[in-house]
Curated annotation (Swiss-Prot):
Gene3D superfamilies: Homeodomain-like. Residues 215-236 have a biased composition (Basic and acidic residues). It comes from the Eukaryota. Residues 198-236 are annotated as: Disordered. Sequence-specific transcription factor which is part of a developmental regulatory system that provides cells with specific positional identities on the anterior-posterior axis. GO terms for biological process: anterior/posterior pattern specification. This is Homeobox protein Hox-C6a. Its main location: nucleus. GO terms for cellular component: nucleus. It comes from Takifugu rubripes (Japanese pufferfish). One of its GO terms (molecular function) is DNA-binding transcription factor activity, RNA polymerase II-specific. It is found in: Nucleus. Belongs to the Antp homeobox family.
Length: 236
């Protein structure tokens, strides 16, 4: 039995009197004029015209050694039932791939953390950066700001004239010395504390000197009076 045949029940005509399927011999084996499509019936490849048809038979067999295709009334319902299952399988595959990617990322993170923990930390690595205050070790204290000689000189000049700065003047000095406003504020606070300590020390030193001098004068005066009394007694 030849695999390609002309079914008289599939005879459909177009509006212009043109047949969908031309006169093709029964024993023709060429694929140029008529091409077989397993799921959508026969179609003309030259004009690309696809004709819908209805077959009274429940099962139509195309070719030997092929599976039977059902073109009955329930085929569209079966397709609708198949679509959700296909979507579910696709969603399952996508979730599995997503879980695999997350697992690989977690393994990479844990590997990097283990490598960081295995790195030895030396004392020189724990030193703080004086400008940024960021260190390599576990100690996160801020480093002390180191000012240059020019910066300290300009700040001392400003402090000599003004013990307290306004915000406008502070911004001007910060821009001129390439420092931040906070650094200027902290420097002036520390300088005022130092100045108060120095003034307190000088006042205590001068006070002690004054008290010591007065005591010496009193002792000298007391000694002079005692000597005068002794001389008066001798004269008598």
């Amino acid at each position: 039995m030849n695999s390609y045949f002309a079914n008289p029940s599939l005879s459909c005509h177009l509006s212009g009197g043109q047949d969908v399927l031309p006169n093709v011999p029964l024993n023709s084996t060429t694929y140029d004029t008529v091409r077989h499509f397993s799921s959508y019936g026969a179609a003309v490849t030259q004009n690309r015209i696809y004709a819908p048809f209805y077959s009274p038979q429940d099962n139509v067999v195309f070719g030997s050694g092929r599976a039977q295709y059902d073109y009955g009334s329930n085929v569209f319902l079966q397709d609708k039932d198949v679509l959700p299952s296909c979507r579910q399988t696709n969603m399952g595959l996508s979730t599995q791939s997503h879980i695999a990617q997350e697992y690989s990322l977690d393994q990479g993170r844990t590997g990097t953390q283990e490598q960081k923990s295995n790195i030895p930390i030396y004392p020189w690595m724990q030193r703080m950066n004086s400008h940024s205050g960021v260190g390599y070790g576990t100690d996160r204290r801020r480093g002390r700001q180191i000012y240059s000689r020019y910066q300290t000189l300009e700040l001392e000049k400003e402090f000599h004239f003004n013990r307290y700065l306004t915000r406008r003047r502070r911004i001007e000095i910060a821009n001129a010395l390439c420092l931040t406003e906070r650094q200027i504020k902290i420097w002036f606070q520390n300088r005022r504390m130092k100045w108060k300590k120095e003034s307190n020390l000088t006042s205590t030193v001068t006070g002690s000197e004054q008290t010591g001098g007065s005591q010496e004068e009193r002792e000298d005066r007391g000694g002079a009076t005692e000597e005068g009394k002794d001389e008066d007694k001798k004269k008598e």
